[in-house]
């Protein structure tokens, strides 16, 4: 999966590396991610739970409990040996497990839930042999810039070089197994994704698993079946609890809780962590993303398990300023049309309606607002909006009823 001699990731290996962290070399090192669990944290000196600081609503007093490693689990009821152990049956973990299996590895895939889980509908990558290398390089620099120069350029380059092949591989596998997926090519890409700093010529493969309510989650259930038929051993309802390290300090396995007690999965070649985010761990979320304290959560049971295990094994979660991922307006398909925007709580206009959609949440972080606002427009919008050339995407009243039935 990872070429330790060359220090590079192969294109097929990218499918495994995409799972967030490959923790089989010299121990886990760094992990970028999100965070949330109980209120307050533990003081690193006393071990007691520290209360909220009360300063600007931040929970930053003492060492958070999720960073404190628990006692090692020693009551092991069963030990199993594999080449590769993947934790998390999602859109990263399942392709990683299947790819490793096809490469000849004996693979175990551990999943906390009773089925595969994944969200969203699309994934994109650049078709490198049909794209302008200068445009690809410009896009890589743009992504670093748009991330306030906090992104890892090397990680972005992995996506630039390998993303297209990886997405196409998944798309083809799901389609061949009967999943509902198509390639939308460049249709979902904005102008900024196709023409960067004057450089043109980017071509994308864009998988779309849909239409809704069908999603990536349904596609991953199909791919999980493909993986099982290929020889991957999938352990559902088997949450990973701790990573195991060998005498040299390298991660060499995973301890998970099975139906009859704790199981140790030894991994001769490596462990891949693909456990998703931490939006449902309140302590982690309030620690790393205090802006989201009053926002609702779209998902459930996403408690940063992989982040914690990697930290307990000696790794590091990326510093604060994690992405909020507040980019989904399922109930408002014309979010990018500058209709009057008012707060739900007060009915008052609160912003310049040309603000980028992903930034709107920054105006709505209070307990009263909790991320809620309304767009106001009348029935004449069907005649007016099409005349606003270059502004938003027009949606007919008939199509709007699909989202907001009377």
Positions of predicted regions on the chain:
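Beta1/beta-strand and adjacent pyrophosphate-binding region of the FAD-binding site
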Residues: 76-90
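Conserved N-terminal glycine-rich FAD pyrophosphate-binding loop of Rossmann-like flavoproteins
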Residues: 113-135
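Glycine-rich loop(s) and the adjacent beta-strand/alpha-helix scaffold that form part
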Residues: 258, 266-329
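An anion/pyrophosphate-binding glycine-rich loop and adjacent beta-alpha core
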Residues: 307-309, 316-406
């Amino acid at each position: 999966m990872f070429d330790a001699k060359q220090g590079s990731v192969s294109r097929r290996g990218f499918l495994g590396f995409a799972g967030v962290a490959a923790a089989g070399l010299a121990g886990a090192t760094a992990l970028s991610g999100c965070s949330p669990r109980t209120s307050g944290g533990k003081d690193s000196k006393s071990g007691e739970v520290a209360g909220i600081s009360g300063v600007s609503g931040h929970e930053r007093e003492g060492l958070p409990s999720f960073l404190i490693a628990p006692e090692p689990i020693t009551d092991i009821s069963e030990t199993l040996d594999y080449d590769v152990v993947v934790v998390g049956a999602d859109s990263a973990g399942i392709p990683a497990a299947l790819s490793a299996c096809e490469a000849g590895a004996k693979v175990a895939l551990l999943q906390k839930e009773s089925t595969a889980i994944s969200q969203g509908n699309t994934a994109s990558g650049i078709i490198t042999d049909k794209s302008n290398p200068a445009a690809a390089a410009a896009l890589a620099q743009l992504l670093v810039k748009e991330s306030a120069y906090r992104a890892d350029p090397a990680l972005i380059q992995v996506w630039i070089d390998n993303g297209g092949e990886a997405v196409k591989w998944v798309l083809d596998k799901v389609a061949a197994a009967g999943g509902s997926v198509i390639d939308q090519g460049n249709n979902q890409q904005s102008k900024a994704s196709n023409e960067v700093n004057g450089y043109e010529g980017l071509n994308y493969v864009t998988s779309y698993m849909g239409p809704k309510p069908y999603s990536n989650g349904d596609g991953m259930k199909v791919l999980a079946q493909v993986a099982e038929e290929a020889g991957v051993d999938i352990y559902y309802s088997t949450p990973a609890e701790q990573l195991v390290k060998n005498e040299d300090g390298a991660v060499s396995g995973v301890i998970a809780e099975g139906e009859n007690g704790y199981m140790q999965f030894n991994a001769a070649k490596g462990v891949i962590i693909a456990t998703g985010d931490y939006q449902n761990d309140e302590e982690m979320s309030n620690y790393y993303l205090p802006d989201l304290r009053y926002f609702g959560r779209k998902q459930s049971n996403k408690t940063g398990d992989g982040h914690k295990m990697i930290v307990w094994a000696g790794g590091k979660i990326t510093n604060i300023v994690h992405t909020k991922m507040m980019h989904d307006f399922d109930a408002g398909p014309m979010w990018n049309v500058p209709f009057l925007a008012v707060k739900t709580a007060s009915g008052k206009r609160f912003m310049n309606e040309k603000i980028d959609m992903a930034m709107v949440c920054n105006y709505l972080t209070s307990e009263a607002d909790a991320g809620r606002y309304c767009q106001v427009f009348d029935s004449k919008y069907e005649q007016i909006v099409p005349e606003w050339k270059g502004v938003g995407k027009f949606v007919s009243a008939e199509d709007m009823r699909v989202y907001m039935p009377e």
